[in-house]
């Protein structure tokens, strides 16, 4: 985990989408009670789990959009007492998950003093952005993405074909 700001850590992992080599970011936020919220969790590895557990107890798993749920089941199995928050579209798509709260339905009491949630309506992915009030940090998933420069011939073809660069 890389410290980002007071109470915020990030970890970056590889992702391949539509043939493009991208990165994806997991953000860890500390709540008032010292527990953690994992936003868009990456693949669960022993090293990553140990790094997260060193920061505090995992209390919340957060799928910020319909595309950021791929690894959340691994974390839910590892931390069965953690509450799982997900967009409404995942309720039908991921019947294998125990979704404790549909984002936007009711406020999460544990977030009220430190996190504001804003559901971006009209966006097919049903993305929710978070504002971490203690540091005034905006946490996003797909609304903002730094793809970087194409690394090889495949990227040079695939990026423009997908409207990037």
Locations of regions flagged by a protein language model:
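Metallo-beta-lactamase
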Residues: 2, 6, 16, 37-38, 86-127, 133, ...
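Active-site metal-binding motif and surrounding structural segment of the metallo-beta-lactamase
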Residues: 43-87
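Divalent metal-coordination and catalytic microenvironments
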Residues: 29, 65, 84, 130, ...
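Glycine-rich phosphate-binding "P-loop"
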Residues: 10-14, 31-44, 101-105
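Short, hydrophobic/aromatic-rich segments at coil-to-beta transitions
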Residues: 5-11, 37, 112-117
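Zn-dependent metallo-beta-lactamase
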Residues: 1-32
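Active-site environment of divalent metal-dependent phosphoester hydrolases
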Residues: 18, 45-46, 67-71, 91-94, ...
